[in-house]
Amino acid sequence: MTKLTVKALSEEIGTPVDRLLQQFSDAGINKKDGDSVTESEKQSLLVHLKKEHGSVDDSASPTRLTLQRKTRSTLSVAGSGGKSKDVQVEVRKKRTYVKASALEEEKKAEQLKAEAEEQAKRDAEEAAVRELEQKAQREAEEQAKREAEAEAKAKREAEEKAKRAEADKAKKEMTKKNEQAKKEAEELKARQELEATRKAEAEAAKLVEEARKLAEENEARWKEEEQKKSAAEKDADYHVTTSSHAREAEDAADRKEEQQPRRRKKKAKPAEAAAPRGGRNQRGGRNKKAQVNKPTSMQHGFDKSATVAKQDVAIGETIVVSELASKMSVKATEVIKVMMKMGAMATINQVIDQETAQLVAEEMGHKVILRKENELEEAVLSDRDNSAEAEGRAPVVTIMGHVDHGKTSTLDYIRRAHVADAEAGGITQHIGAYHVETDNGMITFLDTPGHAAFTAMRARGAQATDIVVLVVAADDGVMPQTIEAIQHAKAAGVPLIVAVNKIDKEDANPDNVKNELAQYDVIPEEWGGENMFVHISAKQGTNIDGLLEAILLQSEVLELTAVREGMASGVVVESRLDKGRGPVATVLVQSGTLNKGDIVLCGQEYGRVRAMRDENGKEIESAGPSIPVEILGLSGVPASGDEATVVRDERKAREVANYRQGKFRDVKLARQQKAKLENMFSNMTAGEVAELNVVLKADVQGSVEAIADSLRKLSTDEVKVNIVGSGVGGITETDAVLAAASNAIILGFNVRADATARRTIENENLDLRYYSIIYQLIDEVKAAMGGMLAPEFKQEIIGLAQVRDVFKSPKLGAIAGCMVTEGTIKRSNPIRVLRDNVVIYEGELESLRRFKDDVAEVKNGYECGIGVKNYNDVRVGDQIEVFEIVEIKRTLD
């Protein structure tokens, strides 16, 4: 069978080849001119063409069939000249047949269309109805709103009309009162001016009479002139007299007479009235002041002040009055006047505090800049480079305990050196600071004589110790200094490790030591307490490693850290004056690294580190945290507990040291005053529970326990009695030192203080009280605790003033002219401004005047002028309420 090509197919169906190729391509068949066409491809093309020209069902049968019929015939038509003409007529007919299913679909589509149109019509009608209803509802709401607005407007208009009527009535009454007052003022003014005129005339006549007498005395010399002017003298024309005094007096009288009519026409302006600078007839430059028009008694004397250039006034903690005046560019007398108006008397050389100086400067219209005296000190100490991260450091351990219980021997065995043998009598005579390298790490030890240095440093605010090791001899047990060491450690809040020493002795009884210490709240861990007990023998070295492990374990719990890099800071452990080397200070570095050549500020002393030695006397170049070193090069001997800080600038360090020396006396006085029983209330911190620290000594143990129990029962939620130390026997120096460090009072029951303790108490200005009756002791402590209770306050209204008028003052702003309706208005009390019985401002009075005078108070029924500080929105009808805050003293229930 011959293959049918695309070209042959195009010729067969009468379609151009390009069109046929395009149709094949549309049908998804790619062909060229010479490609053959299979029967299936022809069917695919046919189906594609049918789909393109009309929809087909799944069987490809058409739903619509169109038949075209064409018939040709010849028609004879008569032409011109009687001839007929044959015309070819072709009739074309076209008829379309549609399947029944297609008709049904068309009907169904038409029906759906009709239903959709009907539904749309119904929806449109419903929407129109809803819109009409909403429109009607909106119109009704708008109508109701308009009616309500009209009603409210009518009500407001009626109220405004009533208010205007009341205001007009009040205005008429006020106008009438003002006219009456004005009339009275004019009458008073006329009387005053008439009186002034009479006085001036009398004075002028007196001067003229004196001039006449002078002329008569010099009659011989002026005889010729007197004869020429005798006629003028008879007519009382005194201008021609030769006396300069007479001419001046007459000129002054004439000027006053000429100025009288003009003065009556002018209003009184007290702030602007000034005396004339001489007249045209004055001679010799001697000016006579003209009559100054004084304000009447019906006017308030708020004068317009001269404009003063505002200054930025820097005020320290104290300032001399003359220095304050100089900074404000005014005379010192002006400052004293302002202070007198404020109720403070001062002289030109008097020193006033910062708060008073601030009030005076603000009163005179200047801007105040408050300066701290220690700004330089803060700037120097804050200029430090300690940005490095904190790292772990070695613990600082203080060895404490009773005399000869083995403190130095324990430390000596650890250091592997015989320090104790070199001491006088085997007792430690000076403070030693050492650091030792153990297998488990480094530890720094402070060996103190008893606990004096520990307490002295804590009294100065230095917290150099991390852990306290309490050495107790197993054969002696708890001794007085052991108890004091426990009290000091607890007061400092430092963890305590007990080293029970001398367990190698035959009469050693460690269990007895535990029982005795348990009475002072030192409970072993095996008994459920928090204190570690280590049994050691300093002489034989028994269990020394166990003590070191306990120290390092406690330091791990504390998580001790310090900055290793950067500028160093530390605390002075001990200091002395060496004969050959000058001031020598033992410094415990707490953070940073101390290098040779650094500039160090130690309390009131400063200097460059010329040399550094460790505890063995070896020269070193630097020392890190927890390392004790001896430094040389300070300007003087610092005190134990002073903070040692490395600074950048030696000049600023010298300035800070000089400033601290100047303030030392004030600081000492303040420190002496803080332990007074009467000052306990001032030492309270707001929001914290107040503590009354007590050191209690009695004659017998029973009294100590009874008094301590009674004092503890006095504690409340607000005030707590804290017994920092107690014991049997007289009051010793250690008791006084503990009281000074703990800010405590000393109570002695049937005991007395020895000479050394009395000297310490006197130097520290501590509060020492003796008692022989227990109830008297309890009552006085109870009264002191009552004084430490936070007071209660209530407000009492003492006066009420009604604002009748408002004036404007260039200096004070809005001034309220008031009538005191209730109580008394006092200048020094706080006030409230009420409008329609609602508080709109709370503040204080800036000015209170009665007529032109400043007054301290105005009583009921009198008028006054009130200036409210920092508030100018005072209106007529306002009320100014003056109240005072009354303190209600509280007592213990």
Curated annotation (Swiss-Prot):
Basic and acidic residues bias locations: 102-203, 216-238, 245-261
GO molecular function: GTP binding; GTPase activity; guanosine tetraphosphate binding; translation initiation factor activity
UniProt domain tr-type G: residue ranges: 392-561
Binding site for GTP: 401-408, 447-451, 501-504
Region annotation (Disordered) ranges: 51-203, 216-299
Region (G5): 537-539
GO cellular component: cytosol
Top-level taxon in the UniProt lineage: Bacteria
Spans annotated as G2: 426-430
UniProt-annotated stretches for the region G3: 447-450
Region (G1): 401-408
A matching Pfam family: IF2_N
Alphabetically ordered keywords of this record: Cytoplasm, GTP-binding, Initiation factor, Nucleotide-binding, Protein biosynthesis
Residue segments, region G4: 501-504
Locations listed in the record: Cytoplasm
InterPro entries linked to this entry: DNA-bd_dom_put_sf, EF-G-like_DII, EFTu-like_2, IF2_assoc_dom_bac, IF2_II, IF2_N, P-loop_NTPase, Small_GTP-bd
Functional note: One of the essential components for the initiation of protein synthesis. Protects formylmethionyl-tRNA from spontaneous hydrolysis and promotes its binding to the 30S ribosomal subunits. Also involved in the hydrolysis of GTP during the formation of the 70S ribosomal complex.
Family in the record: Belongs to the TRAFAC class translation factor GTPase superfamily. Classic translation factor GTPase family. IF-2 subfamily.
Listed name of the protein: Translation initiation factor IF-2
